[in-house]
Design a protein with these regions (language model features):
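Glycine/charged-rich beta-loop-alpha catalytic/anionic-binding loops adjacent to active sites
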Residues: 39-41, 72-76, 95-108, 144-148, ...
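Acidic-glycine-rich active-site phosphate/pyrophosphate-binding loop
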Residues: 25-33, 85-98, 135-141, 203-211, ...
Length: 367
């Protein structure tokens, strides 16, 4: 049986940070309030563009896999914040990398994007349609955020993460012990779609929609999302495990969407998982939507949280609403085959200067 195995991983965490202390100066809040309710201490802010972050993460992932861009069959960019509507971010990334043999498309499932992209990659590999797929989760969320709205501004950060999936069909390895994706689950419920909305960037608005602050900012109903997300991720993980012929007792590590520490811990507790079985990096990254799982996976591998042969679970819940989970058995290698010096350009501004345009644009909503 042909399975999709992760052979490379990488991330791009922007060098600028928006700390809780910074937010105390921008909005009526406090470090204690934010940390207690979200688990976040700081979040990355990008001074460049979405594709710049995606390229950095992708080059690190390709180096880790020991591959060249020309080895790729497909690029899937998971994002709700592309630079432009057309060409797709994936096509722009293909050009940047020189991945001339790769098909490319964008996928938008909000915070569930990387899981949706991973299931798509694994399915295409299992079907024999592709053999080497780059999945990138990337978001530049700060430009959608009203930094006087404490319900949203304390949560979100910018960043990118990437994973290379390759076909593994070694005839000498029995299917029962072979590495790769073992089970998946995807779902959606459009009835609850109003809990997270980005009104602009769509055909519904007028051409002048970017001049309308109310219809340009991210709308997020935190309490409603909390209730749906905990139940949704639990059910999704259980379905994916069942399809893999496993139970929660077989799980070595869960790498969840870093939505909110309370959501993650509530879901983990109900699944019977210990703290050591759950990867969290939200304290220093914030909620980076589609980028959060691959960024957390990168950190898990860098800190020896993933061991050869481990059963690893990705799970996410996002706007749409969407949800999904992936169960996979890790291969023998947890070290990079190579490294890359790819990085964003040096920062030439402060975080206050970066966010000045946001604050000016959304100011009429608070007069």
């Amino acid at each position: 049986m042909t399975r999709a195995v992760i052979t490379g991983w990488g991330k791009c965490r922007p060098p600028l940070s928006l700390t809780n202390a910074d937010l105390e100066r921008l909005v009526e809040t406090s470090d204690d309030w934010i940390a207690d309710r979200t688990g976040i201490v700081e979040r990355g802010m990008c001074h460049m563009e979405t594709t710049d972050m995606a390229e950095v993460a992708a080059r690190h992932a390709l180096a880790a896999a020991g591959l060249e861009p020309t080895d790729l069959d497909l690029i899937i960019m998971c994002t709700l914040t592309p630079e432009v509507s057309c060409p797709s971010g994936a096509c722009s990334l293909q050009e940047r990398l020189g991945a001339v043999n790769a098909a490319a498309f964008d996928l938008n499932a909000a915070c569930s994007g990387f899981v949706y992209g991973s299931v798509t990659a694994a399915s295409m590999i299992a079907a024999g349609a592709k053999r080497t797929v780059l999945v990138v989760g990337v978001e530049k969320l700060h430009f959608l955020i009203d930094y006087r709205d404490r319900n949203t501004c304390v949560l979100f950060g910018d960043g990118a993460g990437a994973a290379v999936y390759q076909a593994s069909d070694d005839p000498d390895v029995p299917d029962a012990g072979a590495p790769g994706v073992l089970g998946t689950d995807l779902g959606a419920d459009g009835v609850a779609g109003s809990t997270m909305v980005v009104p602009t960037l769509g055909s519904r608005g007028e051409l002048s929609s970017f001049r309308d602050p109310e219809h340009s900012r991210l709308h997020f109903e935190g309490q409603a999302v909390f209730k749906i997300a905990v139940r949704g991720m639990i059910d999704s993980v259980c379905r994916a495990l069942d399809r893999a012929g496993l139970t929660a007792d077989d799980v070595d590590l869960v790498v969840p969407h870093q939505a909110n520490e309370r959501i993650v811990r509530a879901a983990a507790t109900r699944l019977g998982l210990t703290e050591d079985q759950v990867m969290l990096n939200i304290a220093t990254h914030g909620n980076t939507s589609a980028a959060s799982i691959p960024m957390a996976l990168n950190d898990a591998l860098d800190t020896a949280r993933v061991r050869p042969g481990d059963t690893v679970v990705f799970t996410a819940f996002g706007g749409g609403v969407t949800w999904g989970s992936v169960v996979l058995r890790w291969g023998d290698r947890v070290e990079r085959l190579g490294t890359s010096d790819a990085a964003l350009d040096p920062v030439d501004m402060t975080v206050d200067e970066l966010l000045a345009r946001n604050r000016e644009f959304f100011a009429p909503l608070h007069d």
